[in-house]
C-alpha cells in the first residue's frame, strides 16, 4: 500500500462564501427551537412541501426532528446514495436534501431535470474539503496507469475525474474485482476506509490522505476502556474510523448495515462508532436496546466534532422552512461535469446488478458480516 503525503486543513474556508471550515460550521448551527416553535415550524414545512410538490430526503446524520419530518411526509431517511436514488425515482420535481453539499450534488446528477434545494449551501464535508478537484485531478494525471476509485463523499468534479464511484457497502467487492483483474488503484478520499479495503483485498492502492472529521476522532484506547464497562456490548463501527477502532469491532459496515446489525444481533447493548445522528434511527428500529456513543478525543474541550458532524448540524427546521418559502439555495451542477460524474455512479450500480448485490445492506446479516465484519484483532 502506498499513500499520498497530503495535509488536510478543515479549519479554514477553502473558498470564501462557498464552503466553511469547522469553526464557521459550528457558528452557523441553528439554535434549538422551543417546543412551540418546533410544532409551528413542522406544520409550516408540511404545508410548504405540499404547496411546492416537494419531497424531503434526509441523511441518517441530521438531527432527529428532520428525520422524523421526512418520515412523516413520505420522504426518505437513508444513506447518501439511497437519498439520491429515492429522489430520482420519486414523482416530485423538487427535492429538498437535508444533508451536506455532495449529497445535493449526487441527487442533481441522478435527477438533472429536477430542482434540488438545500437548507444551507455552506454545509460541506471534511472528506470533500480534503480532496479539491484540481489537486486530485493533477494527482491522477501523475499516475495514469491507475484506475481511479472515489468514495461517494466527494464533489461532482472529483466524481467526474473517476473511473468508479463506490459506497462503503460495495467498495470492498468492487476493489476486489479490480484487483483480480490486475488493476492498480488510486483511492480517494478517505484513508481509513481505503486502508481497510486494501488490507481485506491485498490490492495495490495509492491512498489520498483525507478523513472524516467525525470518524477520525474515535479513539481505540478509550473504546477499549468503554468496552470494559459494558462487557456484553457489541461494537458497531463505520469503516471510516481509524484502524485501532475497527480492530475492536464486532461489525464494521455502512450506516444501513450498522442499523441492520443493531436489529438482528442478539445483544441488548451496543457501542456505536459513527455519527450520533444515527442513534435516532437505531432506537426506532430496535426500541428495546441501548446504544452508547463511542468515545472521541475528549469531552467537548478537545474534540472538534464530538461525534456529530458540524455541517450536518447546520440543517435545521427554520432554514428548511425558509428554503421552501423562498426557493433559494438551489444546487446546480455543470451539465458536462454531471454527465461525466454519472458514469462512475452508473458503473457501480451496474456492477451491483450484475453481481446481484444491493448497494445497501442485503438484509442477510451473515452475508453482510462476511464483507464488513471484523471480529477480534484485525
From Swiss-Prot:
GO molecular function: 4 iron, 4 sulfur cluster binding; metal ion binding; quinolinate synthetase A activity
Role played: Catalyzes the condensation of iminoaspartate with dihydroxyacetone phosphate to form quinolinate.
Entry coiled-coil feature ranges: none
KW Ion transport (keyword) present: no
Biological pathway: Cofactor biosynthesis; NAD(+) biosynthesis; quinolinate from iminoaspartate: step 1/1
Organism whose genome encodes this protein: Burkholderia ambifaria (strain MC40-6)
GO biological process annotation, one example: 'de novo' NAD biosynthetic process from L-aspartate
Positions of [4Fe-4S] cluster binding: 125, 212, 309
TM helices/strands, residue ranges: none
Family, per entry: Belongs to the quinolinate synthase family. Type 1 subfamily.
Cofactor field: [4Fe-4S] cluster
This protein's UniProt keywords: 4Fe-4S, Cytoplasm, Iron, Iron-sulfur, Metal-binding, Pyridine nucleotide biosynthesis, Transferase
EC annotation from Swiss-Prot or TrEMBL: 2.5.1.72
InterPro entries the UniProt entry points to: NadA, NadA_sf, Quinolinate_synth_A_type1
Binding locations of iminosuccinate: 59, 80, 151-153, 168, 238-240, 255
Location within or outside the cell: Cytoplasm
Entry protein name: Quinolinate synthase
UniProt keyword Manganese present: no
Primary location group: cytoplasm
NCBIfam families per UniProt: nadA (TIGR00550), PRK09375.1-1 (NF006877), PRK09375.1-2 (NF006878)
Cofactor binding note of this UniProt entry: Binds 1 [4Fe-4S] cluster per subunit.
Reaction catalysed by this enzyme: iminosuccinate + dihydroxyacetone phosphate = quinolinate + phosphate + 2 H2O + H(+)
Gene assigned in the entry: nadA
Cellular-component GO terms for this entry: cytosol
Amino acid at each position: 500500500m502506498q499513500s499520498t503525503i497530503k495535509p488536510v486543513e478543515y479549519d479554514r474556508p477553502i473558498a470564501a462564501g462557498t464552503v466553511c471550515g469547522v469553526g464557521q460550521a459550528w457558528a452557523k448551527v441553528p439554535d434549538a427551537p422551543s417546543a412551540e416553535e418546533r410544532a409551528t415550524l413542522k406544520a409550516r414545512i408540511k404545508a410548504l412541501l405540499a404547496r411546492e410538490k416537494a419531497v424531503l430526503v434526509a441523511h441518517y446524520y441530521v438531527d432527529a426532528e428532520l428525520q422524523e419530518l421526512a418520515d412523516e411526509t413520505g420522504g426518505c431517511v437513508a444513506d447518501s446514495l439511497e437519498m439520491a436514488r429515492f429522489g430520482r425515482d420519486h414523482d416530485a420535481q423538487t427535492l429538498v436534501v437535508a444533508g451536506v453539499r455532495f449529497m445535493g450534488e449526487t441527487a442533481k446528477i441522478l435527477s438533472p431535470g429536477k430542482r434540488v434545494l438545500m437548507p444551507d449551501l455552506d454545509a460541506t464535508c471534511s472528506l470533500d474539503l480534503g480532496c479539491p478537484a484540481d489537486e486530485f485531478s493533477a494527482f491522477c494525471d501523475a499516475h495514469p496507469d491507475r484506475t481511479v476509485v472515489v468514495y461517494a463523499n466527494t464533489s461532482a468534479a472529483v466524481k467526474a475525474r473517476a473511473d468508479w464511484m463506490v459506497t462503503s457497502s460495495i467498495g470492498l467487492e468492487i476493489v476486489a474485482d479490480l484487483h483480480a483483474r490486475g488493476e492498480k488503484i488510486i483511492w480517494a478520499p478517505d484513508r481509513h476506509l481505503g486502508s481497510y479495503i486494501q488490507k481485506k483485498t491485498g490490492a495495490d492502492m495509492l491512498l489520498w490522505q483525507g478523513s472524516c472529521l467525525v470518524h477520525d476522532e474515535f479513539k481505540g484506547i478509550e473504546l477499549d476502556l468503554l468496552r470494559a464497562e459494558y462487557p456484553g456490548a457489541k461494537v458497531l463501527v463505520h469503516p471510516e474510523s481509524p484502524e485501532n477502532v475497527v480492530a475492536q469491532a464486532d461489525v464494521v459496515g455502512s450506516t444501513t448495515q450498522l442499523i441492520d446489525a443493531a436489529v438482528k444481533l442478539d445483544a441488548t447493548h451496543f457501542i456505536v462508532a459513527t455519527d450520533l445522528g444515527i442513534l435516532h434511527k437505531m432506537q426506532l428500529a430496535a426500541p428495546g436496546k441501548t446504544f452508547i456513543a463511542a468515545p472521541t478525543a475528549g469531552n467537548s474541550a478537545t474534540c472538534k466534532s464530538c461525534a456529530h458532524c458540524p455541517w450536518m448540524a447546520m440543517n435545521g427546521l427554520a432554514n428548511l422552512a425558509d428554503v421552501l418559502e423562498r426557493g433559494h439555495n438551489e444546487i446546480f451542477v455543470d451539465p458536462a461535469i454531471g454527465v461525466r460524474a454519472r458514469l462512475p455512479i452508473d458503473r457501480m450500480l451496474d456492477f451491483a446488478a450484475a453481481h446481484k448485490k444491493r448497494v445497501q445492506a442485503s438484509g442477510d446479516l451473515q452475508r453482510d458480516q462476511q464483507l464488513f465484519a471484523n471480529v477480534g484483532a484485525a
